């Protein structure tokens, strides 16, 4: 018998591709009620961060002048244990005046690493223990 969880499970190999992006979107929809489109793409991320993230091999849009992604915004809210409400976060009117940006940053990667008890170097290596830990957690919810 195959359960829904195992049927939708993603690979836990420490490499982030479109499958991990889709899994994260589903995970954020489940735990944050984020209402994200599950398309397997983390949109509009700063190209300057790509060298810091060699473990990301697909499912990301690296651009100059990045506007950010609702998926990363939801993940940042989750990591900070804050409710997700997209319109409020962008203008600073979220809880305690918080602004959650939707771009990947070194502090954001360190926050993800701290969540999993992994050494905080602000990188997503190839392959990455941090990505593998996230993939394992995603599989608990999708």
What spans do the regions from the language model cover?
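Cell-envelope/ECM-targeting effectors and their regulatory/trafficking segments
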Residues: 1-142
């Amino acid at each position: 018998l195959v359960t829904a969880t195992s049927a939708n499970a993603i690979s836990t190999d420490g490499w982030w591709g479109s499958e991990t992006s889709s899994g994260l979107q589903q995970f954020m929809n489940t735990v944050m009620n984020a209402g994200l489109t599950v398309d397997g793409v983390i949109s509009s991320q700063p190209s300057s961060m790509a060298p810091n993230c060699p473990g990301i091999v697909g499912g990301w849009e690296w651009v100059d002048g990045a506007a950010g992604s609702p998926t990363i915004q939801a993940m940042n809210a989750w990591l900070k244990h804050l409710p997700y409400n997209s319109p409020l976060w962008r203008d600073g009117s979220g809880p305690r005046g918080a602004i959650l940006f939707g771009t990947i940053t070194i502090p954001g990667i360190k926050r993800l690493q701290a969540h999993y008890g992994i050494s905080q170097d602000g990188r997503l290596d190839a392959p990455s223990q941090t990505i593998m830990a996230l993939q394992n957690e995603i599989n608990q919810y999708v």
